[in-house]
């Protein structure tokens, strides 16, 4: 979930 605009992807980047 790094180059995806999915909610879990964003959560991974933020977390």
From Swiss-Prot:
GO terms for biological process: proteolysis. Transmembrane segments: none annotated. Its main location: secreted. GO terms for cellular component: extracellular region. The keyword Secreted applies. Its EC number is 3.4.21.-. It is found in: Secreted. Optimum pH is 9. Activity is relatively stable between pH 8-10 but drops at lower pH and is absent at pH 4. GO terms for molecular function: serine-type peptidase activity. Optimum temperature is 45 degrees Celsius. Belongs to the peptidase S8 family. Monomer. Protease capable of hydrolyzing gelatin and cell surface heparan sulfate proteoglycans (HSPGs) in vitro. This is Alkaline serine protease. It comes from Termitomyces clypeatus.
């Amino acid at each position: 979930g790094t180059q995806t605009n999915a909610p879990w992807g964003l959560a991974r980047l933020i977390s």
